[in-house]
Design a protein with these regions (language model features):
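Extracellular loop and loop/strand-boundary signature of outer-membrane beta-barrel proteins
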Residues: 17-21, 80-85, 137-141, 210
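Transmembrane beta-barrel strands of outer-membrane/channel proteins
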Residues: 3-11, 58-64, 108-112, 170-176
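Residues on the lipid-exposed face of transmembrane beta-strands in outer-membrane beta-barrel proteins
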Residues: 30-36, 60, 96-101, 153-158, ...
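Short loop/turn motifs that connect adjacent beta-strands in outer-membrane beta-barrel proteins
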Residues: 1-3, 35-58, 102-106, 121, ...
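Signature for the C-terminal beta-barrel architecture of outer-membrane proteins
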Residues: 143-211
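Surface-exposed loop and membrane-interface regions of Gram-negative outer-membrane beta-barrel proteins
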Residues: 24, 44-101, 122-123
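Outer-membrane beta-barrel translocator domains and adjoining extracellular loop/strand segments
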Residues: 15-20, 46, 70-77, 121-127, ...
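Residues that define the transmembrane beta-barrel architecture of outer-membrane proteins
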Residues: 11-15, 22-30, 90-95, 147-151
Length: 211
């Protein structure tokens, strides 16, 4: 069993025209990740052989967030009802939970997860499978922190060496039902609201497909 995590506090002040200052972010995050290898080198729990199944592990990631800006920031706390503040300042969720298995030359990851294709620092070219949560400080956060994990199946076929290529593989992703759009807010009362008037409608829910 492997367990790791972190506790993080982020505080940001805004100074309009360099006169005065007000809090626009005071976000406190705690995350814990547990990984259990119940099958290694073809042996489950150290004694049970499962044939061609070589490796298997279960990963669970949980996250809790408290954004106290809705309590200590007068510019925002006075604009919301108690019920609205409770909804916005707390977030508790099972962020990711997935099963990894390896049956060489195939490997599978099944569950709620992030899939990254061609990650870059400032824009997403191929890394568009998971939607984004852009409701808070989205311009300065890592993609990993603001991606929304989805329930899906990820499969990789390891081809190995082909000519000058030392490693090559084929990857497929199947999202059977978990369609979510990126989350943004245009509510001017919120500190990270986007420009009002942006269309946020999705015309059609896409069908289940393989990429």
């Amino acid at each position: 069993m492997e367990i790791e995590g972190f506790v993080q506090a982020q505080t940001i002040l805004r100074t309009p025209k360099f006169q005065g200052a007000k809090f626009i972010l005071q976000r406190n995050t705690a995350q814990i990740e547990a990984k259990y290898h119940f099958l290694q080198e073809g042996q489950a729990f150290g004694w049970l052989s499962l044939g061609p199944l070589e490796d298997a592990s279960l990963t669970v990631i949980g996250r809790g967030v408290y954004d106290s800006i809705y309590d200590i920031g007068d510019a925002f706390s006075d604009k919301f009802t108690h019920q609205e503040k409770m909804k916005r300042k707390f977030e508790y969720k099972l962020r990711e939970v997935y099963l990894d298995t390896a049956i060489p030359p195939f490997s599978f990851r099944i569950g709620r997860q992030q899939v990254v294709w061609g990650e870059t620092d400032n824009f997403r070219a191929l890394d568009v499978i998971n939607p984004l949560d852009s409701r808070w400080h989205w311009t300065r956060e890592s993609w990993e922190d603001i991606r929304i994990p989805l329930w899906m199946v990820r499969a990789i076929y390891d081809i190995g060496k082909i000519g000058p290529l030392e490693e090559s593989f084929v990857e497929a992703v199947w999202i059977p039902w978990d369609f979510q759009r990126s989350k943004v807010t245009t509510d001017p009362r919120r500190p990270w609201a986007m420009i009002r008037g942006i269309a946020l409608q999705v015309q059609e829910k896409p069908r289940s497909c393989i990429r």
